[in-house]
Curated annotation (Swiss-Prot):
Name of the protein in question: G patch domain-containing protein 4
A GO-annotated cellular component: nucleolus
InterPro entries: G_patch_dom (IPR000467), PINX1 (IPR050656)
Composition bias type Basic residues, residue spans: 398-408
Species, as recorded: Bos taurus
Length: 408
């Protein structure tokens, strides 16, 4: 057990220091013989309004009601006669004589007689007192409860009863306990103690017993039904919970597989996109090279046939159109512009298709196949135009074919 040290004030510390200077140690008493006090006096605050010499335990030890009953019992005298018992109250004078104060004049001497000129005269009062002392002591008068109630005119120590607050229920319980205790002593079953005022007829008791017997099976049936309903509800709830858990597991597994498939497609799709882009770039390079070769061949053929010269003297709308249409330089420039525009548009379309294709290989493959088909068609068209541009084709035939293409 750890004892907390006392917190000392400045005054206590100063006093201890002064005593220690003069040879005092803790535990010694004050004085030359060291038999004085060992602890310092301490001032305490008085928190109440009681005077000096007040005993706080007096309210617990002072039995005022007992003194009151003793005083009233001392003032009563019970006389038994042939007619009956009679209670008589003593007057205040008699009570004063009985409890007279002792005479302290001759406290240490016994007065037997008075000296006179003729001689001693004995005291009559003393003789009477001696006669009274020689008699036997009288037994105390013990009063019963009924006598005390009559003497007190029905008043008791319970002050609340004067205002109508009685203890009938408590007294009834005590009486019932006494009856049960007496029944146990006699060897009978205590049962339910009943008062005379609350006694009931045997017919009513029989009816109550029958009602209880009839109610018991109904209550048991109801309790069984409630228990069965409760168990059914608990089973249903458990089944629902199991189903919910199973559905959640299935959905989680599906989501996991879908995510894994998406990741795999992303990985494979990225590789497919790279391959498709490389393949498309190669095809476009080949197309450009082929177009360039075809243009060079056509220019060489035109130069060889016409000698690179055009008649300037011929004037007219038809001849001018023919010259422009049949002029190899004009043709080659326009073709190059058209081809470059077509190639640029194809590049843009391919890039958009690759971006939109996302992460799936099937879409990218289908898009690349479609673009290949388009590029093949355009190649055929270019070849046909080159054939038409040749020296053996008329301008009328070329115009008709162009109109048909526009309609298509």
């Amino acid at each position: 057990m750890s004892i907390t040290p006392e917190v000392k004030s400045r005054g206590m510390k100063f006093a201890e220091e002064q005593l220690l200077k003069h040879g005092w140690t803790q535990g010694k008493g004050l004085g030359r013989k060291e038999n004085g006090i060992t602890q310092a006096l301490r001032v305490t605050l008085k928190q109440d309004t009681y005077g000096v010499g007040h005993d706080p335990a007096k309210e617990f030890t002072n039995h005022w009601w007992n003194d009151l009953f003793n005083k009233t019992a001392a003032n009563l005298v019970v006389e038994t006669r042939q007619d009956g018992v009679q209670i008589r109250r003593l007057s205040k004078e008699t009570t004063r004589q009985d409890h007279a104060k002792p005479n302290l004049l001759y406290q240490k001497f016994v007065k037997t007689a008075t000296l006179t000129s003729s001689g001693e005269k004995p005291d009559k009062d003393w003789e009477s007192c001696s006669d009274d002392d020689s008699q036997e002591p009288k037994p105390p008068n013990v009063l019963t409860d009924e006598m005390l109630l009559q003497a007190c005119e029905g008043r008791t120590a319970h002050k609340a009863a004067r205002l109508g607050i009685t203890m009938k229920a408590k007294l009834a319980r005590l009486e019932a306990q006494e009856q049960a205790f007496l029944a146990q002593l006699k060897g009978q079953d205590p049962g339910v103690p009943q008062l005379q005022s609350e006694s009931k007829s045997p017919k009513k008791k029989k009816k109550k017993r029958k009602q209880k017997e009839e109610e018991e099976p109904t209550t048991t049936e109801r309790s069984a039904e409630k228990y069965s309903e409760h168990t059914d509800e608990s089973i249903r709830k458990s089944k629902k919970k199991k189903r919910q858990h199973q559905e959640e597991r299935v959905t989680d597994e599906r989501e996991g597989t879908a995510i894994e498939n998406e990741e795999e497609t992303i990985r494979t799709g990225g590789l497919g996109e790279l391959k498709n882009r490389e393949h498309v770039d190669r095809s476009f390079r080949k197309k450009k090279r082929r177009g360039q070769h075809h243009e060079e061949r056509a220019e060489l053929a035109v130069l060889d046939n016409e000698g690179g010269k055009v008649a300037v003297s011929e004037v007219g709308t038809e001849e001018a159109e023919r010259r422009v249409y049949t002029h190899p330089c004009g043709r080659s420039k326009k073709r190059r512009q058209h081809e470059e525009e077509d190639l640029n548009t194809e590049d843009e379309e391919v890039e958009e298709a690759l971006v939109d294709s996302g992460t799936r290989e099937a879409e990218s493959r289908s898009c690349s196949d479609q673009k290949r088909g388009r590029s093949k068609k355009k190649r055929r068209q270019y070849q046909e135009e080159e054939v038409l541009d040749g020296p053996g084709v008329n301008t009328a035939q070329k115009a008709k074919k162009k109109k048909q293409k526009k309609r298509d």
